[in-house]
A protein has these predicted regions:
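Alpha/beta catalytic cores of nucleotide-metabolism and tRNA/nucleoside-modifying enzymes
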Residues: 99, 115-133, 152, 156-167, ...
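Glycine-rich, positively charged N-terminal anion/phosphate-binding segment
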Residues: 1-57
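Pocket-edge positions in alpha/beta enzyme catalytic cores
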Residues: 36, 80-81, 146, 215, ...
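Short glycine-/acidic-enriched loop or helix-start segments at secondary-structure transitions
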Residues: 13, 46, 73, 176-177, ...
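Active-site beta-loop-alpha junctions enriched in small/polar residues
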Residues: 7-9, 37-39, 67-69, 109-113, ...
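Hydrophobic faces of well-ordered beta-strands that scaffold small-molecule active sites
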Residues: 2-5, 32-36, 62-64, 104-108, ...
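Alpha/beta enzyme core
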Residues: 45-78, 85-163
Length: 294
């Protein structure tokens, strides 16, 4: 299932057009989860009703993000800062549950400050408030994404609550996802940074975890073609250049002469230049000794 980007309940309440764009499902998406953040129960209640009306039957879950460690979020008391305010966090869950026609879920971290481990207690309070699922990331907010995620946090939360638990943190591949399901009490797995340059990871993880299907290796040409499609979609929907360069670097990693190609990506200033560069890369790969890119 696809999650939206983090959507500000304040933005929805103020009827910001830029915010509303974030909740619109693509025509080919059968279902989505809308991920909300904020601090005011009344704004969450408004947002849930408004999203339900806007998204309709495609809405499967409402998620409250209590895990984001970004400074611009936590300085407003939002995201992972809510882990310091469990009663306020519970009131947000309750406000959503009262209005929602779909399950309400929460995403949390191991704790807020370095060395804290409050996830299990916090998760139990969110379940009491009505959360139907708890997702937990094995780092504290102060760690951001440094160090290693402590997967034992998943087991601690699962032992404390009776609702499904989703594991998160350091899932960079299909193999990581399968290992988390095997080694922890997680009922499901979030894949976030593991998607960078690897849009196949979701299907690969499902096939590996459920059916034991080995992860296939993608050729350089397959990766170039996927990058082309990704850049085209990005060009059609969002500000392009900064993200286009980042996405290109992820896909090109590990390809023949990757450093040289990444250097040329930085010089691209338009979508058309990106496409021309990919044409050149495909032509070189097709005739070179590493044509299959393996």
């Amino acid at each position: 299932m696809a999650y939206t980007e983090m959507v500000s309940v304040a933005g929805l309440s103020y009827k910001s057009a830029k915010t509303w764009v974030l909740v619109e499902p693509e025509p080919e998406e059968p279902q989505i989860c809308v991920q909300l953040f904020g601090t005011k129960p009344e704004q969450f209640a408004f947002a849930v009703n408004a999203v339900q009306e806007r998204v309709g039957d495609k809405l499967t879950l409402i998620d409250i993000n209590m895990a984001c460690p970004a400074r611009k979020v936590i300085t407003k008391g939002e995201g992972s800062a809510l882990m310091k305010e469990p009663e306020l966090a519970a009131s947000l869950v309750e406000a959503c549950v009262r209005e929602a026609r779909v399950p309400v879920t929460v995403k949390i971290r191991r704790g807020f400050a370095a060395g804290e481990n409050t996830a299990a207690e916090f998760a139990a309070r969110m379940e009491q408030a009505g959360a139907a699922v708890v997702a937990v990331h094995g780092r504290t907010a102060s760690q951001l994404y440094t160090g290693e995620a402590d997967w034992s946090t998943i087991d601690e939360v699962a032992a404390r609550v009776g609702v499904p638990v989703i594991g998160s943190g350091d899932v960079f591949s299909a193999e990581d996802a399968a290992r988390m399901l095997t080694e922890t009490a997680a009922d499901a797995v979030f894949i976030a940074r593991g998607t960078y340059g690897n849009p196949w990871v979701f299907g690969d993880a499902r096939a590996l975890a459920l059916d034991g299907v080995p992860v296939p290796e993608r050729s350089a040409l397959e990766r170039i073609e996927a990058l082309r499609e990704h850049l085209t979609l990005l060009h059609e929907t969002q500000p392009f250049m900064a993200r286009g360069r980042a996405f290109s670097s992820w896909y090109l990693k590990g390809l023949p002469h990757a450093a040289a190609w990444r250097g040329r990506v930085v010089q691209c200033t338009t979508y058309e230049e990106f496409m021309a560069l990919l044409d050149e890369a495909e032509a070189e790969l097709a005739v070179g000794p590493d044509a299959d890119g393996r």
